[in-house]
A protein has these predicted regions:
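Metal-dependent de-N-acetylase/amidase catalytic core
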Residues: 71, 82-234
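Active-site rim/loop-helix segments in enzyme catalytic domains that contact anionic ligands
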Residues: 1-99, 232-233
Length: 234
């Protein structure tokens, strides 16, 4: 997550669902989004950078708790622009090794409105590569080949994002909505992402069979996978 709230809108359902299924989900916020994604907080009297960052941290921690996430970590790298030096990349790669994730989630590969998002995904792929390298901290367990799912951006057509996976999040929707409402600094997005989940629920129903026996998902999230999936049968 490039900023502290991104995981809530775009992958909150996936986080809550997989935690419920027995996974231990780790959330990484590369920044708090304190400069560029906290307009409501900056309009408050007496706002300072430290106060805004503290508010965003508290909101994100509350949202992660609402989703039941196993862990949330804040790298506090700053935003607008988000930048990571070699040491920060090693920090993320080492975390990937420690967690050994079954899969990863990040932003779309392209975002002309918010370059922090695309940068976060570029770095995620780079750190995945580093974590797979036997010559990085020799002797440690290297990372396998977890799939990278790109969660849905705000304006899909502009971001050249095309979903190939729909995830039914109906059973955990209440958790996601509770997490959404933790993000007081971006209240203008609450209803938008509720409507989006309903629309993706419609797409889930249609793509699972529609009126010919499709599953009755009310809420869903969409993802675009980066790497091929290896299967034993179709």
């Amino acid at each position: 997550s490039a900023h502290a709230a991104d995981f809530v809108w775009r992958a909150g359902g996936a986080i809550a669902l997989h935690q419920q299924l027995g996974y231990e989900v780790t959330i990484v916020c590369l920044s708090y989004g304190e400069r560029g994604e906290s307009a409501k907080l900056w309009k408050e009297q007496g706002a300072t950078l430290d106060k805004v960052k503290a508010s965003r941290r508290n909101e994100a921690k509350a949202a992660a708790q609402a989703l039941g996430a196993h862990d949330i970590q804040f790298f506090d790298l700053g935003d607008y622009p988000l930048e990571m030096d070699r040491q920060a990349k090693f920090q993320l790669a080492d975390l990937m090794r420690a967690v050994q994730p079954r899969f990863l989630m990040s932003h779309s590969l392209y975002d002309p409105y918010n370059t922090d998002h695309a940068y976060a995904t570029q770095v995620t792929m780079e750190c995945r590569m580093i974590a797979q390298a036997w010559g990085h901290n020799p002797g440690e367990q290297v990372l396998g080949a977890p799939q990278l799912y790109l969660f849905e951006p705000h304006q899909t057509e502009q971001m050249q994002w095309k979903p190939d996976v729909f995830l039914d999040i109906t059973s955990v929707w209440d958790r996601k909505r509770a997490a959404i409402e933790c993000m007081a600094g971006q209240q203008h997005l609450w209803d938008y992402y509720t409507n989006l989940a309903q629309n993706r629920g419609n797409h889930f129903r249609r793509n699972s069979g529609g009126q010919a026996g499709g599953r009755s998902a009310r809420y869903a999230e969409g993802f675009q996978s980066v790497y091929p999936r290896t299967v034993d049968e179709l």
